């Protein structure tokens, strides 16, 4: 088995069972293409999401080190910060979140609703900053201060996107390969590409388990020239830790994130409304709405390798719908 080294890494069981992989019949009829969805939005803690896969590995490492505090960073409406805080609460750990307002809004819903509201329910210690210009350094500075107060902090990077955290999506590739055994001729997998860990983990796993399947990352914050090196760096780091080679090219589409990270756009919001009205599935304005817009346009523009079925990775994010009202 090519991924057998994965079992060497301690893993905290947070999800419990494979997330569903479902066929979307009404969307498929609408688009004229078989569309499947991997429901990582329904992982079991705090309204779900993909970051729990990363936290299974990262928090296991934190506990191994004897940490009593998890420190991480993100936007005010970060899904990653929300899930990290929830896991900390579940385990009786302290959580400190370094937050920025990346869109510079004064809208009350964005500042207080959605994921931000949930952070208060989890008793998260909030530290605001003007901008996460160098998040690794900023997190380390914060950790030093927290440690001086008598805590034992463990730093979790933005998005949980380290090589260790991304092992969660190598693990996900195993699930996908097994669940797709009955999907005839799967052509492509589409995922939002942001902090890059989810994309890179899938890239390593799928290269070795489903080498004929095309993986497309739809960027949500950066142009290809800036995003591709981030994905490749993590891809190679993951492969190195698993004693594998990673030679698959990284495919990115950057046509769908404008005007910028965290700012809704028309195509993304149309995708959110379409999935809700056709399938009762909730996407979000920041990640999955834009990724689905890429999938829809990719079919229209014939950007995929062939006409086979497409699998969409639903990474979660529905709490942001409340924060972005009245945009939705």
Curated annotation (Swiss-Prot):
Cofactor(s) the record lists: pyridoxal 5'-phosphate
Pfam families noted in UniProt: PALP (PF00291)
Cited InterPro entries: ACCD_DCysDesulf, D-Cys_desShydrase, D_Cys_desulphydr_bac, TrpB-like_PALP, TrpB-like_PALP_sf
Keyword Lyase recorded: yes
Keyword hit for Lyase: yes
Covalent S-S links between cysteines: none
GO biological process, one term: D-amino acid metabolic process
EC number: 4.4.1.15
An annotated Gene Ontology molecular function: D-cysteine desulfhydrase activity
Modified residues (N6-(pyridoxal phosphate)lysine): 51
Protein keywords: Lyase, Pyridoxal phosphate
Reaction it catalyzes: D-cysteine + H2O = hydrogen sulfide + pyruvate + NH4(+) + H(+)
Top-rank EC class of the record's enzyme: lyase
Protein function: Catalyzes the alpha,beta-elimination reaction of D-cysteine and of several D-cysteine derivatives. It could be a defense mechanism against D-cysteine.
PANTHER family registered for this protein in UniProt: 1-AMINOCYCLOPROPANE-1-CARBOXYLATE DEAMINASE-RELATED (PTHR43780:SF2)
Quaternary structure and partners: Homodimer.
Family statement: Belongs to the ACC deaminase/D-cysteine desulfhydrase family.
Protein name in the entry: D-cysteine desulfhydrase
Organism of provenance: Salmonella schwarzengrund (strain CVM19633)
Gene: dcyD
């Amino acid at each position: 088995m090519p991924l057998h080294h994965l079992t060497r890494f301690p893993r905290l069981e947070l999800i419990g069972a494979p997330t569903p992989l479902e066929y979307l019949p009404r969307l498929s009829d609408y688009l004229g293409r078989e569309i499947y969805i991997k429901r990582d939005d329904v992982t079991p803690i705090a309204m779900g999401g993909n970051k729990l896969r990363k936290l299974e590995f990262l928090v296991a490492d934190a506990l191994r080190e004897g940490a009593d505090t998890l420190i991480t960073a993100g936007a005010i409406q970060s899904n990653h910060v929300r899930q990290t805080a929830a896991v900390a609460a579940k385990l009786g750990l302290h959580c400190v979140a370094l937050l920025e307002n990346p869109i510079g809004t004064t809208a009350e819903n964005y500042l207080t609703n959605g994921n931000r509201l949930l952070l208060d329910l989890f008793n998260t210690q909030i530290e605001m900053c003007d901008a996460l210009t160098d998040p690794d350094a900023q997190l380390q500075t914060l950790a030093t201060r927290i440690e001086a107060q008598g805590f034992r902090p463990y730093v979790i990077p933005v998005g949980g996107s380290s090589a260790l955290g991304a092992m969660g999506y190598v693990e996900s590739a195993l699930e996908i390969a097994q669940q797709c055994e009955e999907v005839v001729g799967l052509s492509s997998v589409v995922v939002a590409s942001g902090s890059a860990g989810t994309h890179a983990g899938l890239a390593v796993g799928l290269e070795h388990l489903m080498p004929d399947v095309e993986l497309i990352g739809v960027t949500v914050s950066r142009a290809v020239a800036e995003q591709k090196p981030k994905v490749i760096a993590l891809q190679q780091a993951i492969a190195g830790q698993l004693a594998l080679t990673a030679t698959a090219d990284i495919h990115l589409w950057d046509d769908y994130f404008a005007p910028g990270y965290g700012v809704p756009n028309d195509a993304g919001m149309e995708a959110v409304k379409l999935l809700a009205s056709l399938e009762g599935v909730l996407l979000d304005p920041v990640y999955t709405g834009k990724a689905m817009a890429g999938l829809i346009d990719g079919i229209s523009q014939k950007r995929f390798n062939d006409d086979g079925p497409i699998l969409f990775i639903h990474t979660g994010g529905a709490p942001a719908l409340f924060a972005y009202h009245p945009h939705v």
